[in-house]
Regions:
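Catalytic cores of nucleic-acid ligases and guanylyltransferases
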Residues: 1-171
């Protein structure tokens, strides 16, 4: 799920693209964000559930979808059985500084500086090398990923708009 993480001290929100708070569905991720992300930060990214399937680590869309459930007991059970991760790809604010009008290259550099990663919160890989991107595109299909994303390095962040190109596998 696409999600924006809002952290201000102990307060953590996981906002969906539509503005719905997803935090109650991913309690293990809320705790990880408190441990692994800076005190005051807003990061755009995705919530994923990686699982070992047929000897390979893949992203499990079905396990992720099951997490949106009204029963707290089921959410807790699934949080233990199929723990989620947050994969950040864009920094919006840090320690009160707004980066949304900065070019993507600058936001990315700052994200790498402030989000050191951990067990549950990681940063997407990027490349500006065409051969590497083509290799990833081929390899990622077997990992359950739709494809790759291309962004302009000089683009500013546009809320509620897709300022990227999705290159998807043919289905």
């Amino acid at each position: 799920f696409r999600a924006i993480v809002f952290r201000d001290g102990d307060e953590v929100r996981l906002g969906s693209r539509g503005g719905k708070d997803l935090a109650r569905y991913f309690p293990e991720l809320v705790e990880a964000i408190r441990r692994e992300l800076p005190e005051r930060v807003v990061v755009d990214g995705e919530i994923v559930v990686p699982r070992e399937i047929d000897g390979r680590t893949r992203l499990d869309w079905d396990a992720l979808s099951e997490r949106i459930h009204p029963a707290d007991s089921r959410v807790q059970m699934l949080a233990e059985k199929t723990p989620s991760m947050f994969v950040g790809f864009d920094l919006l604010t840090h320690s009160g500084t707004d980066f949304m009008n900065e070019p993507f290259a600058a936001r990315r550099a700052k994200l790498l500086e402030v989000m050191v990663g951990g067990d549950r919160c990681q940063i997407t890989s990027t490349t500006d090398d065409t051969a590497t991107a083509q290799d990833w595109f081929q390899r990622f299909e077997g990992a359950g990923l739709d494809g790759v994303i291309a962004k302009k390095l000089d683009s500013v962040y546009l809320p509620n708009k897709r300022e990227m190109v999705k290159i998807k596998h043919a289905r």
